[in-house]
Amino acid sequence: MTTQTSLAATFEDERYSWARTRGTRHRAVLAEAALLAVLVAATLTAATTDQGWTTAYFVAWTAGLLLFIPLHSLLNLGIRGVFDRGLHSLDEHQQGMREHSHARVGWPMTALTFAAWTGGIALAAGTGHTALALCLGFLLWFAAGLLPYWHLAWTLPDEAEEDPLAA
């Protein structure tokens, strides 16, 4: 039995069916991945300077994280929010999709989490920029947490159109 919450109702609302197309989901995944790659590159670039944390880096970091919010909202609408809803609001099929995506990206998630730790430690030890090391670790750990979202959005087929004459 599923319980309809206001969050679940938003994700199930047909006004957002445009976000559930495969092309839209693919573009959202690519945009999120590119955004995180740019933030990682900016972090590594800032770490090569003597100053480290600069105003320009802070602006890039803030703008990137603010841009992430609408991108992830779009992605979440495309996958009906199956990772952000409680189990009680998902049907068996949605629960299965969620579990399958987690299972498929388990090893890459572990590798990215390990890279977050080792990359952050190596950056701090090599450059002395602790704040940037924390940013790098956060970004890689964040990407690890996004892998199930990306996997589901990328592999989920387009939803079948309901035939109004079939009723």
Predicted features and spans:
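Alpha-helical transmembrane segments and their membrane-interface junctions
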Residues: 37-47, 109-128
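Membrane-water interface of transmembrane alpha-helices
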Residues: 69-86, 151-156
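Juxtamembrane loop-transmembrane helix junctions in multi-pass integral membrane proteins
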Residues: 16-23, 48-55, 97, 126-129, ...
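Hydrophobic alpha-helical membrane-embedded segments
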Residues: 49-77
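Cytosolic-side membrane-entry/anchor segment at the start of a transmembrane helix
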Residues: 1-36, 149-167
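Short membrane-interface loop/juxtamembrane segments of multi-pass integral membrane proteins
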Residues: 86-104
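Juxtamembrane/interfacial segments around transmembrane helices
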Residues: 80-90, 109-119, 162-166
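Hydrophobic alpha-helical transmembrane segments and immediately flanking/interface helices
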Residues: 56-61, 120-150
